[in-house]
Amino acid sequence: LEASPLLLNSEIIELIGQGMWLFTGSDGNVRVETDINSFTEFSAVKPRGFSKNRVIRVIDSIGNDIKDIFESMYIGKVDNSEQGRNLFKKEVLQYFETMQNINAIQNFDPDSDVIVEQGDELDQVICDCYIQPVDSMEKLYMSVTLSI
């Protein structure tokens, strides 16, 4: 198998920097060069990790899954009291433990990474989550010391 057109390494780097998703050939195999999306405007608020599809899939899953948990088990069913919010927090903590066990997130601290509080209105719940997604190995920087 071959990827076409054949690109120089400098061209590959340039295209990836532009947010291009591309295929390259190596040892008769075609592979995705890197699992990125088109996001290229990095900042302190949205660093380079936001250009990585694996990271975005984790972030999207967290938002969707916690929304589903809240809607299916808590809306209209559980009081917005300290006890009710603690039940929800326990559910979120279990979810993140599972996410860490499947290597979707890392360095999760159940004592500090989830805060659930009442919002400004009686029916509002605020859930702040501090997570670190796991990404794939893609780059190797290696030093070799020769002894002659």
Task: Place the predicted regions along the sequence by residue.
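Structured, hydrophobic secondary-structure cores that serve as assembly/anchoring elements
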Residues: 1-148
